[in-house]
């Protein structure tokens, strides 16, 4: 078997994707399919941590205009990410893939607190580590969390799973003439204003020289394909 392209990665999943075709909530068949993809990718030999959003359950930004303060709303959203991590952890364990959820918040009855040492330990043991609670601070997205955690644990890349197969010059769903980039620098991604990740995430990735691979999660097996170097996507790297 060929060596995977990366020894350790952070996979960033959107919470909305876990809802499947539903407007909100957790769609179990979708969670099970993603768990299968993650387990298959782990079998290639790459150590995998996962940061998942919480938008399928709660979005703090949306309630800030309805009387809930932004910090409170963001905290509620970060707690939603822990729920998604627990759902993925259970789905992975059912498949026989050992997993461990870690949270940025202290909640010992629910899951262990994130520390770099704990993440290193579980990753080296072959577990898939699920990172919930965002950064633990309001105003930071889970995209930024993914880059931050990747830098902290020494990951070699962030795999940003989306519903399109890379970064395009414009929205390919609205503009049939949109072209896909094979490669961009972090600075080009920032200056171009591409909406695939927020500016803070791109800036932190640039500062830490961390590659981001943007790809579509819709195709089963796409995570493994990226790790093997055969997947379709856009590499954002300096």
UniProtKB/Swiss-Prot annotation:
UniProt keyword Metal-binding, yes or no: no
Reaction equation(s) it catalyzes: UMP + ATP = UDP + ADP
InterPro entries: AceGlu_kinase-like_sf, Asp/Glu/Uridylate_kinase, Uridylate_kinase, Uridylate_kinase_bac
EC number annotated for this UniProt entry: 2.7.4.22
Pfam family, one: AA_kinase
Alphabetically ordered keywords of this record: ATP-binding, Cytoplasm, Kinase, Nucleotide-binding, Pyrimidine biosynthesis, Transferase
Superkingdom of origin organism: Bacteria
Any GO BP annotation: UDP biosynthetic process
Top EC class, one word: transferase
Annotated binding of UMP, by residue: 54, 74, 135-142
UniProt subcellular location: Cytoplasm
GO cellular component, as recorded: cytosol
Regulation: Inhibited by UTP.
MF-aspect GO terms: ATP binding; UMP kinase activity
CDD domains the record matches: AAK_UMPK-PyrH-Ec
Annotated pathway: Pyrimidine metabolism; CTP biosynthesis via de novo pathway; UDP from UMP (UMPK route): step 1/1
Binding site for ATP: 12-15, 55, 59, 162-163, 168, 171
Subunit and partners: Homohexamer.
Record-linked NCBIfam families: pyrH_bact (TIGR02075)
Functional note: Catalyzes the reversible phosphorylation of UMP to UDP.
Family membership noted in the UniProt record: Belongs to the UMP kinase family.
Protein name: Uridylate kinase
Lineage per the UniProt record: Bacteria, Pseudomonadati, Pseudomonadota, Alphaproteobacteria, Hyphomicrobiales
């Amino acid at each position: 078997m060929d060596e995977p392209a990366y020894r350790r990665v952070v996979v960033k999943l959107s919470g909305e994707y876990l809802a499947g075709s539903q407007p909100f909530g957790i769609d179990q068949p979708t969670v099970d399919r993603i768990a299968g993809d993650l387990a298959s990718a782990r079998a290639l030999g790459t150590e995998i941590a996962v940061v998942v959003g919480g938008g399928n359950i709660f979005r703090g930004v949306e309630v800030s205009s309805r009387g809930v303060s932004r910090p409170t709303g963001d905290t509620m959203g970060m707690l939603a990410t822990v729920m998604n991590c627990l759902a993925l952890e259970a789905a992975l364990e059912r498949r026989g893939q050992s997993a461990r959820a870690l949270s940025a918040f202290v909640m010992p009855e629910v899951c262990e607190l994130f520390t770099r040492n704990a993440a290193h330990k579980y990753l080296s043991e072959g577990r898939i580590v699920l990172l919930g609670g965002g950064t633990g601070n309001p105003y930071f997205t889970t995209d930024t969390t993914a880059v931050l955690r990747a830098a902290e644990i020494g990951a070699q890349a962030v795999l940003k799973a989306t519903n399109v197969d890379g970064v395009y010059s414009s929205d390919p769903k609205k503009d049939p003439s949109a072209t896909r980039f094979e490669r961009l620098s972090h600075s080009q991604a920032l200056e171009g204003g591409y909406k695939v990740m927020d500016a803070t995430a791109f800036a932190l990735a640039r500062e830490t020289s961390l590659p981001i691979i943007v790809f579509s999660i819709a195709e089963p097996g796409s995570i493994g394909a990226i790790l093997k170097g055969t997947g379709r996507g856009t590499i954002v790297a300096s």
